[in-house]
Amino acid sequence: MRISFQNVEDAAMSSYQNLRAIVIDAVREYCAEHYFRPYIWVEVDSACRVPTEYVKDGMIILDIDDEAVRGFQMNDEYLSFEARFGDETDSMEIVVPLNRIVHVAAAEQAVEGASFMASPTSPELLEKLTGSSVAPRRPMRIK
């Protein structure tokens, strides 16, 4: 069997995103144990479903604490939840590919979080997230 560079790169990217999900889960658990609020810093692209009025210089910071969001779900490709912003009474569905998350930390200790490099969203994931329904391939981790 011949392994191409592309196959190795795909496998590495899959592991990298999986590691990101594990780190995000760990930070959320740490924050819950210490009564902190977990935040993510997102480098927004067209696959991100976020309120654009809060995006500054291509970035948005989101509170992912259980008290701030409803229905938090995460798989190896993206996370999603519902949240309200500003004075809005209706909640908005937020969807963020994991490859666009550049930092995760407790709001109270932002410099002690974990940082990542943003990578381009794959065409397949972009199509999945911008289509009419968002359906993950793997079982969701629900907190």
Task: Enumerate the predicted regions with their spans.
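Eukaryotic intrinsically disordered, low-complexity regulatory linkers and tails enriched in Ser/Thr/Pro
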Residues: 1-143
